[in-house]
Amino acid sequence: MEINPVGSYANLSNGMDLHYLEFCSDIDQVATVIFIHGSGPGASGWSNFKNNVDAFSQMGYSTIVIDIPGYGQTSKPTDAIYSLDFFTQYLDEFLVHKNITQAILVGNSLGGAIAIGYALAYPDKVSHLILMATGGVEER
């Protein structure tokens, strides 16, 4: 089975163009998985997750890899305050744009913190969290 990514942009509020790759397989979709990458020089969804998306897609998941605001091919507003609320707002706008009512979130590093923040703000929209080397988690 060949899985071909489709690169697109979601035009969101304040002129934000959020870039994403969507991987569709030819089998019935089980659920939607959103991959949220971490930060760092050259960070993007594809650079973080290029070795993971095929496995999910081949199991029948609708798989979407986003470039978070400020990274990859997504808009990089210079006047924005890149807070957790900023990222979760745009993640929610993206899910609404794609008509996704519930998703599995996979977050790496900063992406994990965004996934946690999103799950806390919108618990009904997240079915599962998969976290890797996540920031924003306190040890108690």
What are the residue ranges of the model-derived segments?
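Short amphipathic alpha-helical segments
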Residues: 47-48, 76-77, 118-119
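N-terminal cap/lid segment of alpha/beta-hydrolase-fold proteins
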Residues: 1-18
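Flexible, active-site-proximal loop/turn residues at the rims of small-molecule/cofactor binding pockets
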Residues: 40, 78-80, 135-136
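Conserved SAM-binding loop
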Residues: 43-55, 92, 105-114, 134
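Conserved HGGG/HGGXW glycine-rich cap/lid loop of the alpha/beta-hydrolase fold
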Residues: 16-73
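Conserved hydrolase catalytic core segment
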Residues: 100-140
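Active-site loop/oxyanion-hole signature of alpha/beta-hydrolase fold enzymes
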Residues: 13, 21, 58, 62-106
